[in-house]
Amino acid sequence: MVKIGVLGLQGAVREHVKSVEASGAEAVVVKRIEQLEEIDGLILPGGESTTMRRLIDKYAFMEPLRTFAKSGKPMFGTCAGMILLAKTLIGYDEAHIGAMDITVERNAFGRQKDSFEAALSIKGVGEDFVGVFIRAPYVVNVADNVEVLSTHGDRMVAVRQGPFLAASFHPELTDDHRVTAYFVEMVKEAKMKKVV
């Protein structure tokens, strides 16, 4: 069984844990840097990205997270987690973890009152996934090596680049665990490759 960490500094941590467990993997709430060595994949939950960055800096997680990404272990960022994974952020000089060749705009779908749900077709997941968008970012631009898994209107809302997965929406806030199960499969595949 693969062990998937959920960064436990802020956001919908409990909901991600429940979704990971429902997808047949072991979930670990990561609150200490040394826990990164014990896991096969990591979820960066949604929340408020500037608050998340402050907490990451306060607890000295940034370099260990970048090292985790460089090791090739899978990472899945939802909402604010997508912002953390992006190499380029509109209106900001520097990236956070910067593992994905994507350009992201924060709060691109509007403020809290503009939050909404939408039926999404997600490549490798299904045609009828309900995406929950809360002050959601979206992907403005991708490099050629990034696969677009889903769009809402003309906006890219789910992308994959090798071991990295990012979504504008909150899959953990529904009872549909297919997106988390997709990530669990990514983690299993990556772990199998390491063993071979």
Curated annotation (Swiss-Prot):
What range does the record give for the signal peptide? none
Keywords of this entry? Glutamine amidotransferase, Hydrolase, Lyase, Pyridoxal phosphate
**What PROSITE patterns does the record point to?**
PDXT_SNO_1, PDXT_SNO_2
The terms describing its cellular component in GO are: cytosol; glutaminase complex
Q: Tell me if Ubl conjugation is a UniProt keyword of this record.
A: no
- Entry's transmembrane regions: none
Q: Which GO terms describe its biological process?
A: glutamine catabolic process; pyridoxal phosphate biosynthetic process; pyridoxine metabolic process
Catalytic residues (UniProt): 79, 170, 172
Query: So, what pathway does this thing act in?
Result: Cofactor biosynthesis; pyridoxal 5'-phosphate biosynthesis
Q: Which reaction does it catalyse?
A: aldehydo-D-ribose 5-phosphate + D-glyceraldehyde 3-phosphate + L-glutamine = pyridoxal 5'-phosphate + L-glutamate + phosphate + 3 H2O + H(+); L-glutamine + H2O = L-glutamate + NH4(+)
Single GO MF annotation: pyridoxal 5'-phosphate synthase (glutamine hydrolysing) activity
One family from Pfam that matches here is SNO
Q: Which amino acid positions bind L-glutamine, per UniProt?
A: 47-49, 106, 134-135
Entry EC number(s): 4.3.3.6, 3.5.1.2
The lineage's top-level taxon is Bacteria
In which family does this protein belong, per the annotation?
Answer: Belongs to the glutaminase PdxT/SNO family.
What role is this protein assigned?
Catalyzes the hydrolysis of glutamine to glutamate and ammonia as part of the biosynthesis of pyridoxal 5'-phosphate. The resulting ammonia molecule is channeled to the active site of PdxS.
> What subunit structure does UniProt give?
In the presence of PdxS, forms a dodecamer of heterodimers. Only shows activity in the heterodimer.
What name goes with this protein?
Pyridoxal 5'-phosphate synthase subunit PdxT
- Origin species, per record, is Bacillus cereus (strain AH187)
